Curated annotation (Swiss-Prot):
Homodimer. Required for insertion of 4Fe-4S clusters. PROSITE patterns: HESB. This is Putative iron-sulfur cluster insertion protein ErpA 1. Keywords: Iron, Iron-sulfur, Metal-binding. GO terms for biological process: iron-sulfur cluster assembly. Iron-sulfur cluster binds at C49, C113, C115. Belongs to the HesB/IscA family. Binds 1 iron-sulfur cluster per subunit. Its cofactor is iron-sulfur cluster. One of its GO terms (molecular function) is iron ion binding.
Length: 121
């Protein structure tokens, strides 16, 4: 008797969503800076009225423990500590009557503050 192993490939869902709108805005900001090596780093840190808050910065360096997602030629970086809080989140950019800003829709957040800049899990 011989056992035949069946090679089944399943498509894993992305750990987070980086929208076209967010990628386009990041590309625009990188072009303004004139440094094509920049990547958007999204992170979670302690603070805010709900316990944690989101942060955004540009970075030229990809660390060994970073998770990287590339969309429309733009790279998004999330460090290992922040990753656990952002799994399943959508990183978007909104420009509406309330203003223009990057927005994170996070299914892991059990509550958030009124301004939406901090959350708890």
């Amino acid at each position: 008797m011989s056992a035949v192993a069946e090679n089944i490939q399943t498509e894993m869902p992305a750990p987070f969503v980086f929208t076209d709108s967010a990628a386009s805005k990041v590309a625009e900001l990188i072009a303004e800076e004139g440094n094509p090596d920049l990547k958007l780093r999204v992170f979670v840190q302690g603070g805010g009225c709900s316990g944690f808050q989101y942060g955004f910065t540009f970075d030229e360096i990809t660390n060994e423990d970073d998770t990287t997602m590339t969309k429309n030629g733009v790279s998004l970086l999330i460090d290992a500590m922040s990753y656990q809080y952002l799994v399943g989140a959508e990183i978007d950019y909104k420009d509406d009557l309330e203003g223009a800003q990057f927005v994170i829709k996070n299914p892991n957040a059990s509550s958030s503050c009124g301004c939406g800049s901090s959350f708890s899990v």
